[in-house]
Amino acid sequence: MTRSNIAPELVADMTGWRRDFHRHPELGFDEHRTSARIAELLREFGLEVHTGVGGTGVVGVLQRGNGEASVAFRADMDALPITETGNPEWRSAPVSYTH
């Protein structure tokens, strides 16, 4: 996906979400803030949301049509125990791990 495929009014929001997630990394099975924010966004988009899947996982369900076909997307939310280099404005707050 490129910026040209995204509605212009969403680009700033999406950039903000990405930077926020990067600024607040959480290690595997400890992504409580991240999963809560993702669930909140999915609800705002009108999806049915299931939380606590496998611990901190989130599932968003978008119902369309007669339900005979399904599409699934998966994304990792966990950070890695790596020290971040550089100093961008979205630098991870705990510098001992990052996305």
Ranges and model annotations:
Residues 1-23, 81:
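N-terminal hydrophobic or amphipathic helices/low-complexity stretches enriched
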Residues 69-71:
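Structural motif
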Residues 74, 78-92:
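Acidic-glycine-rich active-site phosphate/pyrophosphate-binding loop
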